[in-house]
Amino acid sequence: MIEFVKQTAIRAGLFALSEQRRLDTSAIYSKQTAKDLVTDTDRAVEQLIVSELEKRFPGYGIYGEEFGHSNTNSEYCWLIDPIDGTASFIHGLPNWAISIGLHKNGVPVLGVVYSPVMNKLYYAETGKGSWCNGEKLSVSPYQKLSDVIVSTGIACIRSEWTEENNLKFLSRIAPKVVDFRKYGSAALDCCSVASGQLGAYWELKLEPYDYGAGELIVTEAGGRVSDLYGKNNYPEHGIIFTNSSIHNEILQEFYDYKALHR
């Protein structure tokens, strides 16, 4: 199964890459807000992926970013983000990827993330580890928050909702780490945690298709995933991916901030 999904992701990614090189601004649209963007390519890529998966695995549910839900109560459900990092895609940046995850009864069992610009194919299956271009992945060995680079998103400051502005958490964490990065693709951020490049990545607002593949890639590489309270109520209560070793330390920082600002 995973070989088919990998080839589907590669095919979709190469198609998207060819479209990026000739992207017409008239093919860019807004979704819920003026800065929540989608392109004709996002939609075409999702249709390509769904078509391939439905032919090979009929009856499986589909949860895609662009065309919504289909048969999601089935035992197996695909979670698809056709271009994770659309803003980067539009502006010619490399930080975007194809993300395809498979859940069985709500539990991730397979994940594939393909970055066509960087030519990196990340993948994982339950119990088989995480891999990139044939090399086994492992999270970073660092034991302290002060030794790692972290990533997050601050898209909240571009939208209408401001109740839970991630900048306040970033300002709490940033002085305590080596450095901060913002890549703009949840799938690639997860893969960076799995690869040992990042010690942690968190978000306040994600959809299941954003991390549908990345969650398993992180955990199979030895990482840990939880909400911002250390429980499994994600993404409703935020979501964080770490190398496991620093998980409790960074959660304590979130807790301390909330305790100070009640």
Summary of predicted features, one role per range:
Residues 34, 118, 233-236:
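Short acidic/glycine-enriched loop/turn segments that link adjacent beta-strands
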Residues 1-83, 249, 255, 262:
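N-terminal subdomain of lithium-sensitive/metallo-dependent phosphomonoesterases centered on the IMPase/IPPase/PAP
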Residues 103-107, 117, 126-129, 135, ...:
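Short loop segments at secondary-structure junctions
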Residues 72-131:
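DPxDG-like acidic metal-binding loop motif
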Residues 43, 47, 66, 82-85, ...:
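Generic detector of well-ordered alpha-helical packing
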Residues 138-262:
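An extended, acidic
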Residues 70-72, 105, 123, 141-144, ...:
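Solvent-exposed alpha-helices and their adjacent loops that cap or buttress functional pockets
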Residues 16, 42, 53, 86, ...:
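Residue-level signal for inorganic ion chemistry
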